Amino acid sequence: MNLNFRKKIKILTDFRSNLKMFNLDKNKIQEIKKKFKNIEFEFVDLNKMKKKYNADIYWGTRINDDIFKRCINLKWIHFGSVGIDKLDYDNVDLKKILVSNSKSINSDAVFNLILYFLIDTSRKILKGKNLNNRITYEKIYKKCKDLSDQKICVLGYGNISKKLQRFSDLYKLDIKFLSQRKNKKIDVINEREFLNNIKNYDTIINLLKFNSKNNNFLNKKIFDKMKKNINLILVGRLKTIDLSSLSFFLKKNKNAMCYMDGILEEPKLNKIKNYKNIFITPHIGGYFKNYWIKQISIFEVNLKLFLSKKKLKNLVN
């Protein structure tokens, strides 16, 4: 495939990082340019807060309202992740600007992390951390429940939840899904049913995407209804959690356990990241070895469609 177009297409990207996982290096760029001759790349300079950019396409994970306002003639934003909530869409004319994401490419990676956390709820090895004394560990273990004896609720139903459902079917787990979707093949509950039954759940897995309705969905009112020894697996968007209320809940209820995949530099996590009943991974849920192979593949497919003025895949608007 070698595509030539009359107009030069400018692609603005923020994929410049010390982490190889999120670094679009020269070799990757050259491979893309071999296939699409009339394109050029420019990296966002996050240190120049007033710089304006004239670009047709934005490709990355860090575009926010400030960067968006400094982009001139933008026609398409492609997120290199599933989450698209860094933009306030009240300020984006979705009739003029296409928005797509990279859903499904890292679903397996996130599922693997959740599975790691979920299995630990029945052993609490992460809570014991470096314990090498079985008598001391037994104090922790006696408060655990085997997965087969737990009542589990998953907040949200998408690609990752479908994988959890298949795992649940295989191991005969008691698992319900909070979702507005009606599906006879899964045990779906609505928000009212969830609120009425919170006290019955041993483990709650948060996979909620962020929107105005889900802002601080997990708040003091909900935490107060939970079991005092609840297991919380929080890999959804941080904005769906009232972190102050979470901090208060974990401090008060030492037998509760929280597993979180979040940005450790997040100021609101300062209070809780050293608690003994929380285990935080540094926002690596989406990490997997073939990220760039899949990311470039979906971007190139959409770039070809964009240049041909055809409908893009994974559109969110």
Regions found by a protein language model. Name each.
Residues 56-131:
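Phosphate/diphosphate ligand-binding glycine-rich loop within oxidoreductases
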Residues 59-60, 79, 205-206, 234, ...:
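Redox-cofactor binding/interface segments in oxidoreductases and associated redox assembly factors
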Residues 93-105, 228-231, 247-262, 274-286:
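Rossmann-fold dehydrogenase core element
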Residues 1-55:
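N-terminal glycine-/charge-rich "phosphate-binding" loop or analogous flexible N-terminal tail
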Residues 2-4, 100-113, 127, 265-317:
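C-terminal helix-to-coil terminal segments
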Residues 181-271:
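Rossmann-like adenosine-cofactor binding region
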Residues 42-52, 65-68, 186-201:
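Short acidic low-complexity segments
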